[in-house]
Amino acid sequence: MPRSRDEDDELDGDYEALDLEEEEEEDEEEEEERGRGGGGSRRKRGRSNFIDDYAEEDSQEEDDDDEDYGSSRGGKGAASKRKKPSASIFLDREAHQVDDEDEEEEDEAEDDFIVDNGTDLPDERGDRRYERRFLPRDENDEDVEDLERRIQERFSSRHHEEYDEEATEVEQQALLPSVRDPKLWMVKCAIGREREVAVCLMQKFIDRGADLQIRSVVALDHLKNFIYVEADKEAHVKEAIKGMRNIYANQKILLVPIREMTDVLSVESKAIDLSRDTWVRMKIGTYKGDLAKVVDVDNVRQRVTVKLIPRIDLQALASKLDGREVSKKKAFVPPPRFMNIDEARELHIRVERRRDHMTGDYFENIGGMLFKDGFHYKQVSLKSITVQNVTPTFDELEKFNKPSENGEGDFGGLSTLFANRKKGHFMKGDAVIVIKGDLKNLKGWVEKVDEENVLIRSEVKGLPDPLAVNERELCKYFEPGNHVKVVSGTHEGATGMVVKVDQHVLIILSDTTKEHVRVFADHVVESSEVTTGVTKIGDYELHDLVLLDNLSFGVIIRLENEAFQVLKGVPDRPEVALVKLREIKCKLEKKINVQDRYKNVIAVKDDVRVIEGPSKGKQGPVKHIYKGVLFIYDRHHLEHAGFICAKCTSCIVVGGSRSGANRNGGDSLSRYGNFKAPAPVPSSPGRFQRGRGGGYNNSGGRHGGGRGRGDDSLLGTTVKIRLGPFKGYRGPVVEVKGNSVRVELEMKIVTVDRGAISDNVATTPFRDTSRYSMGSETPMHPSRTPLHPYMTPMRDSGATPIHDGMRTPMRDRAWNPYTPMSPPRDNWEDGNPGSWGTSPQYQPGSPPSRAYEAPTPGSGWASTPGGSYSDAGTPRDHGSAYANAPSPYLPSTPGQPMTPSSASYLPGTPGGQPMTPGTGLDVMSPVIGGDAEAWFMPDILVDIHKAGEDTDVGVIRDVSDGTCKVSLGSSGEGDTIMALPSELEIIPPRKSDRVKIVGGQYRGSTGKLIGIDGSDGIVKIDDNLDVKILDLALLAKFVQP
């Protein structure tokens, strides 16, 4: 700063003694220096005696001043550096002295560049002249103001930023439109064509150039049905839009007022107020539309860290990290799935555990991505997220939800859901509760709603009345019993009664669907309205059975806006899908009948009870049947509109019998094996009727080849199709017409050739009762003469011998009559000397004979020799009813004489023999059937069906004489009971279950069911780890003892 005038006056007083001679001497010295044109160090020092005190700046700050000074001295660079102190004329004396010391140090460093032949002597006059420079002169007093002005001009640029705001405001005011500027006109156009009209006007301007006297066209996305045209006159606008489509030329063109012109293009930007635990949605990238939770905010860098459910394709990631080639095609967006670190390690993906230095939390780092607790922590820009009007659904919140210690879910961050709701949300009289702040959980009623504050009235004493609370700190409050209506969200329009309040979540019993609906308290209002809801969209109504485009099927349980909620036909678990109208293929209206577990017929509207599966114990009428799946309506079931999905074999008809033919167990063994039923007994030997095709047994078909009268033996049997397009399918025979058989498959009824079905048929309950089921009873049947009414003799008297016991061989080796078998042995028990039936009493070794090829004239039934109940003597598979039973308690000798008089196993009189201990079939023998048949063994899971009791599950622990010891419970840890075989049924295993093989070559082996292919199971056997394909009927669920 320049010194004040008072300081100058004091200096003038100190130097009044200086006479005029000194001034003259200085002038003479200057003339001498100019005359020499050279300079030593003394001349350099003298040359700096006089300079313009107000023309130079501080040389230490500005290098340009040094250059100016040096050029004014004839290019003497060294002199300019020696005279740096002369630029500090506006500093105090003390400051000058400090600078002078610094200058001396610089001079010492620059001596190498100065040629100095002389010696500098101290010059007292020079010192006086040096001090004299600071003395102002009267004639230069007026230059102080000029100096101050020049300094301000030079250094004012350093502070120009302080005045930018004021200057900007002025400039903005100057930019506002005035009456001299072009005007803005509103032109009406077709809705949705605003952008198209603007582009057409631009193209028209390009084509016609200056002839189109308009300045600009504006089409705003939020303003429908109008565009803005900037022009000087209305006539110019009319000329521009003349002949254009989508513009209503006959409509009046409106002039926008000048003060409103700026509002057309002004954008109201709201400051984003983000805090932790705020819910946001992603706008771009792989996670577009996904819900995210803010965990950190960096306001300086305008970035946030969010927590997302990962969308990571681990296979593609592993390929990328290994350097393998990745397909460049547009990849599908992976579904959201929590990150499994163990799965990533199995794919040899490198996983590093790192600690965040800011939060101290540990994260798993995979390829630069951070994961914690299965979530993906990602840092994104504020521009890539949406903050306004983010309302998560319950499904999304449950994925982010962490169960508390007591196992109940806590929807954390619910208060942040209400931060972006619309204004006018609360109305006078609404019951509210404070959700955060010092007054949290305070209840009250709304009195008045201001801009951002709500005035509430509370019953708590000592508080202001009314009390002003910020709108973001309030939430609506309801109590159980209130009738409400949903006004926003997924269930908008639904009405119901509040049955439970969980924090700020209401559970409502819907008036239409009678199911529980969860909604936010902020999304409902109290209402007495009861809505019936939409019951039909297009051709589909509520509770219709529909077929979807992916060939799945289900029942419509709810109608939403242009969509349906469909309960799919998956019996294992309830699966609900939201489908569009276009995704439904057709409506299924077929009337199909199926059979329950006990072979009772189930039709629509029949009441059934579920005895197995996740819906066990449910009961109700059948609404739909499709592919063996029942859709049952249970009015006590509050979910899924009351519908339950179950397999028909997991249900029983209410009021139906436990077995179709004989409740006492006459047909109970048909569940365990494919037993053949005996032929009907004729009234007399001559009363047998031949079918029209020459067949026997009152039927045609495979017995005679023609069409018979009466009931066919195939009716009601379960057969397997072995030829044709339906090869491998099984189902019951529902009709026989000549050589065609109608078989009911699970999907439909098909007609196949009679020769295309397998002989391995299973007897169903409504066929004849097996005569081999009673075991050792005395007598087997009540003694009657004859055994059946009006039947004398009981069997065909022309059959000699009457049974196969007089025939050698007794058993079948592919039924080859030329194969001698003495002693007779079963083809699968050749080496078992303990097998029954090897005694001569049963098979007196008669010579081999052609048993089926010598018909006796007049005989209506059997051939001679050796009558048979079975088929003709062609090679075939045959499951004998007399399978070997090597049990120690079955006596083989003595047996019963097989005389032609009667069958030994029937106690009829005359000719009958009592059966004690009996040689009939023991049902609890380890083997009770032919091939592909199932039987009981220890450590297998079974269903227990006792008369008058509900079905229980148990594990067979022991198989003894005629009974089974069963431990209740799926793991066999319950009570132990005794059960008859007719009361037990093997539970079929499912995929991945441990199984036990109960028949065939691998009988008794255990393994794992690794797959199911139709009626076959793929089993990995434990003993040799071989994989075998076995019939599911041979597999039982194994329970480890």
Swiss-Prot record:
The modification Phosphoserine is found at residue 59. It is found in: Nucleus. SMART domains: KOW, NGN. Its main location: nucleus. PROSITE patterns: RIBOSOMAL_L24 (PS01108). SUPFAM superfamilies: Translation proteins SH3-like domain. Residues 691-703 have a biased composition (Gly residues). Belongs to the SPT5 family. May regulate transcription elongation by RNA polymerase II. May enhance transcriptional pausing at sites proximal to the promoter, which may in turn facilitate the assembly of an elongation competent RNA polymerase II complex. This is Putative transcription elongation factor SPT5 homolog 1.
